[in-house]
Amino acid sequence: MSCCGGNCGCGSGCKCGNGCGGCKMYPDLGFSGETTTTETFVLGVAPAMKNQYEASGESNNAENDACKCGSDCKCDPCTCK
């Protein structure tokens, strides 16, 4: 298993994303020295939009629904269509 510990994310086209930053990518998990404060602001909420295919009964699943990143930072299994 890589030092990422499975901290990878599948990106577009079933390629592994750049979520794997290597060892100690999360400072609050055993790495200390600096304190970081993060603030999040929610500026608005958009209305729900209906899918154009909804009436015809077609399914529009997200491209990466079936992708998972394995321990070696490669997608496994990749069954995207």
From Swiss-Prot:
Inducing or repressing factors: Strongly induced in seedlings by CuSO4.
A GO term, aspect molecular function: copper ion binding
Family according to the record: Belongs to the metallothionein superfamily. Type 15 family.
Domain of life: Eukaryota
Function: Metallothioneins have a high content of cysteine residues that bind various heavy metals. Functions as a metal chelator of copper (Cu) and zinc (Zn). Plays a role in Cu homeostasis, specifically in the remobilization of Cu from senescing leaves. The mobilization of Cu from internal sources is important for seed development.
Protein name: Metallothionein-like protein 2A
GO biological process, one term: intracellular copper ion homeostasis
Expression by tissue: Abundant in leaves, inflorescences and roots of mature plants. Also detected in roots of young plants, and in siliques. Expressed in leaf mesophyll cells, filaments, stigma and tips of elongating lateral roots.
Keywords: Metal-binding, Metal-thiolate cluster
Organism listed in the record: Arabidopsis thaliana
